[in-house]
């Protein structure tokens, strides 16, 4: 059975037991490497992040459909009728479906090259003296993982249900992109032009580093997790904090003053998605199902209200939706029913 192959190590923790064991959680646990793994309007808290680092984590605005929550479309033309396809919106407004490139290399536009295997690379040299930049937008649907190489050599891994807008070639003063969803960046070094990732909740400024950004709307917070180097986080009314490796800085999206909270964390847990892993630490069923919705491209509908349960574990990337739900169901008080692309969650009958 495939269920028997699921590497989940799932451990259920009741709410009461969680409170007793919370301080005992080992956040420095080691994990294997894996493979694969926007937005309701809420109070807009701008967070500035200046990075002098080698590796850090961030995540940007995303959305999980919970009981029919509506999703704001940034590029309507590209979204209509193309929800399951990877779309590239060119500077001319033309929308190109690049989901199923049959060739290993396809020239799209003045040096842009498309490679098969969910990878897009820009090889045009930077326009250091060009007055107006030409922007492209890459739209990644649910259930898809994509690799983008920008014109300066910066590598970006995009998680499911994400969008990134960027210049085809960067200008002479800075390199700036905007992100919705989640992206893991390996920024090419350039001491003369800082690299900026702009999101609805935070900005990240670097010269050459590797990081992952996270401000999914449905998570209720924006945060930065640092693996190497130093990061300066600024938010609210001029408050700023510097964090060191093994720590995270987070801002509650509902905090009007946008105070920054710094704490220790397991960095490998937060960057696991880039290598194709579900990684949970005392995660509620609600949190798990949010990720299930994004990764498997399904809508989750919770038909009843019941007490939350918490889990610790991980799942390899080749597990089917049915197998994952079967494992969760075997150690949970809920049952699942899958009809096409909808997962119904029900409380088990006694």
Where are these regions (language model features)?
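N-terminal amphipathic alpha-helical interaction or autoinhibitory segments
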Residues: 1-12
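Positively biased amphipathic helices and basic secretion/translocation or surface-docking motifs
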Residues: 13-47
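A residue-level detector for the "anchor" residue at the start of short, highly conserved motifs
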Residues: 34, 43-51, 61-350
